[in-house]
């Protein structure tokens, strides 16, 4: 379960046993949301948010912040997803300290 980003209390991560579509799990304060990144010709078309079946959902304000983060950093998330799931590379977590 590699952590890919930390952002003001949010943890962005992948579960290592998952598959397409490209998505990222976001956790904060014991809550979680999952953001699917929909691309067309390498460009962002849509971000689809869904809730976990096992963990309570992020509160709406946190979900909106997490979605804004995913929108801003989607290329980095996709690169890390491809490196981890396709190329089986080890990925490093990045701590973001500048508010978006």
Show the residue positions of the predicted features.
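Negatively charged, low-complexity tracts enriched in Asp/Glu with abundant Ser/Thr
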Residues: 1-12
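Generic preference for hydrophobic/aromatic residues in regular secondary structure cores
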Residues: 4, 43-50, 73, 77
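Generic structural motif recognizing short loop/turn segments at the entrances and edges of beta-strands
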Residues: 8-10, 31-33, 41-43, 74, ...
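Short linear sequence elements within intrinsically disordered, low-complexity coil regions
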Residues: 10-12, 17-20, 40, 79, ...
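Extended aliphatic helical segments
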Residues: 11, 24-26, 38, 45, ...
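A short, structured beta-strand/loop element
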Residues: 16, 20-61
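C-terminal structural segments of small proteins and small subunits
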Residues: 64-96
């Amino acid at each position: 379960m590699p952590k890919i980003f930390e952002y003001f209390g949010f943890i962005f991560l992948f579960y290592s046993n998952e598959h397409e579509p490209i998505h990222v799990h976001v956790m904060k304060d014991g809550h979680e949301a999952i953001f699917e990144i929909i691309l067309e010709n390498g460009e962002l078309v849509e971000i689809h948010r869904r809730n976990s079946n096992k963990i309570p959902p992020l509160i709406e304000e946190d979900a909106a912040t997490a979605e804004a983060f995913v929108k801003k950093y989607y290329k980095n998330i996709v690169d890390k997803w491809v490196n981890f799931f396709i190329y089986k590379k080890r990925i490093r977590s990045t701590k973001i300290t500048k508010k978006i």
